[in-house]
Amino acid sequence: MVRKPAKMYRNLAKKAYTRREYMGGVPGSKIVQFDMGNLTEDYPVELSIVVDETCQIRHTALEAARIGINRQLQKEVGRANFHLKIRTFPHHVLRENKQATGAGADRVSEGMRLAFGKAVGTAARVEKGQKVFSVWTSPQYVDKAKVSLKRGIYKLPTPARIVEERAPAA
């Protein structure tokens, strides 16, 4: 069965559906890591992707953005000069009422009878102004880190912006 377009799941129409103990089976999350880079160093600059609309972001989109950002940062900044963190977790379970198509589908398909749907994936529910990704780095790498985060924004289903925060000088 083909994957449905992300626009079907983007809006927060109903309350969160997260109680996995009542579900027959939920596909695993594609997100492999939530923290990347140098985790021990404290960096003075934090760059974050902040979403401009309340929406749901599928786990596949989060993973695609993570891969794009991480790969660009490793290539441009170096593995030891940044810390990348995913700030959301895909708790919400997405459901789909599968429809049969083709010849004779009307004999096989149940239509809208028992239309609750089966779990097909997960999504993170984010509010307007919430941070989705954050990168901590040194001041000399800020421009390259912004380019990397811009690459990640293209993979998200909502408008977003990059916010820079600097630690106060001691």
Swiss-Prot record:
Keywords: Ribonucleoprotein, Ribosomal protein. One of its GO terms (molecular function) is structural constituent of ribosome. Pfam families: Ribosomal_L16. GO terms for biological process: translation. InterPro entries: Ribosomal_uL16, Ribosomal_uL16_arc, Ribosomal_uL16_CS_euk_arc, Ribosomal_uL16_dom, Ribosomal_uL16_euk_arch, Ribosomal_uL16_sf. GO terms for cellular component: ribonucleoprotein complex; ribosome. The keyword NAD does not apply. The keyword Cell inner membrane does not apply. PANTHER family: 60S RIBOSOMAL PROTEIN L10. Belongs to the universal ribosomal protein uL16 family. NCBIfam families: PRK04199.1-3, PRK04199.1-4, uL16_euk_arch. This is Large ribosomal subunit protein uL16. It comes from Methanoculleus marisnigri (strain ATCC 35101 / DSM 1498 / JR1).
